[in-house]
Amino acid sequence: VTTLPLPALVAGIAAVAAALAFLVARAALDFRRQFTRRGVLQAVCAGVGALFVGFAFWTHRLPPLHGSAWTLRDMLVRAGAVVTGVLFVVGTVVALLPWMLDRLERGPFASYVAARHVRAKKSGFLTLISGLSIFAVALASFSLSGAISVMGGFSADLKHKILGNNANIVIDTTSQTAWDDYHDVIDEVRAVRGVVGATPEVQGEVMASSSSNLAGVVVHGIDPATIGNVIDLRKNIEAPVKVEDKLAYLEHPEMLQHIPPDEVIGIGSGGEEYTKGPELPPLGDDLDPAVAAVIAAPPLRPGLVIGRELAKTLHVYVGDEVTLVSPLGDLGPMGVMPKTRRYRVAAIFYSGMYEYDVAQVYTTLDEAQSYFAMPGKVTSVAVKVDDAENADRLTPKVVAAIGRPDLRVRDWRDINKNLFSALKLERIATFLILSIEIIVASFCIVCTLLLMMAEKAKEIAILKALGATDGSILRTFMTEGIIIGGIGTLLGVSTGLALCTGLAWFGLRLDPDVYYIDRLPINVSGWDYTVVTLAAITICTIATIFPAKQAAALRPVDGLRYE
């Protein structure tokens, strides 16, 4: 026991103490000195709750999922926190069900009779069918709410990464050609209320090659002084780490000739850091001066910021050389000759999107203008607004501010319209398909009510003989079906909410080499769970209409004929 970490020890002691204290208290308050089923359930919930508190406290002492190495202990602790949290919520809901039924029994005639039917313990097979109906609705509601949360998490994660690596609004020409008077456009855009940043950009497609491989990339010429006001490039840089400004090597490529030995030049997929290592020993005096100069100080090259996946593809690190080859070169005796220029890797970034990390590279604006032979020109102006969700509302203001018919203004939704339309359609289709599970589960409620009507035929006849109307019998059986569906929905939605909230808080690690994300994204939306709850209750309510009408149409003479 002494080898256990302190949080685990505290959690175990707290769980045992809470469970024992609760059991003793129940025994002292129980006049007959007998443990009731409800008391034991409450005691178990208290113990599970104490375990959850212990695991939750322990998870806060673990290293973060992002950028840390995978360990079995960390995953077991996080899984323990999620499981105990879910069990505590489910146990609490189950413990509250008798109290809810008690309140229904104190209500009108329909709710009183319906609650008595649901909690009847002498029905045998009918009670089993009711339990299966509750379980079916709970399982369908749980799967629907969980799937919606996971899909919403992936959609939110994708949107966050797109907004972090792209401008909220892009200004370019309709012919997608370069233009020069961009300084005036930037000043006019920055004057628009709601715009927080604007920066010029030059884009072009080239081929990047190293000594071992090559890949097609998109070059972005950026202004290092203003790029941070629009995208999160500086935040996404993972190497180098020793310099204060992550783009220092890009702005001052001469620093790449003397990288410190302890500087991080690359990050592995598991979070391991690769450093430059010690410098070469001093060269001998007998070495040729020209050779010694080349070995001692590598030639000065412009800087280039590349993504992690591109660095893996080209097998390069910070300080290594990369050659860019453009098909749009100079005209020579043999025709158009490709333009080649050597660069040196100034930084490696990780955006979280494979498409960006494998195909996007950045250099300075002046260097890109020189390489693509467009001096003093840009291909676009990137704009960031204070509220990305309402970027489409600012687009007309930006259009009015620049007053240029030859320029087009598009927001991020318009640029990625096909992607987000597909995600929305997929979300709706998933909701409709999984809603079929609730419809199938509602058939169990129909069977339960029909069996209930057959078993309670005598009771229905007596109630009608005493003055109960067809409407009251109809409301009774509909209320009974709604109670069964409501209990199942409450259990399913609460379990899904507890599980998804736990996964969102404590995290579920995924292999970044396979999924390119280090944890399962979860988006817990109150609106989504409200829609799932209303959909389940509505479907279950509709399912009660037919058996309730059958019960209401039963004549007293038919119910008492064989009595």
What residue ranges belong to the model's regions?
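Short helix-loop junctions at transmembrane helix boundaries
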Residues: T2-V10, F52-V86, L490-V531, I545, ...
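N-terminal Sec/SRP start-transfer signal
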Residues: V93, L97-A140
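A structural signal for hydrophobic secondary-structure junctions
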Residues: H183-Y356, Y362, Q369-M374
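Peri-transmembrane interface segments
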Residues: T2-V10, L76-V77, S123, L128, ...
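Membrane-interface junction motifs in transport/secretion proteins
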Residues: M151, S155-D187, Q203
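Hydrophobic alpha-helical transmembrane segments of multi-pass inner-membrane transport and secretion
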Residues: L9-G12, F125-G152, K424-E459, I482-L491, ...
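C-terminal membrane-exit region of the final transmembrane helix in multipass inner-membrane proteins
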Residues: L20-R32, L97-D102, R106, S525-E563
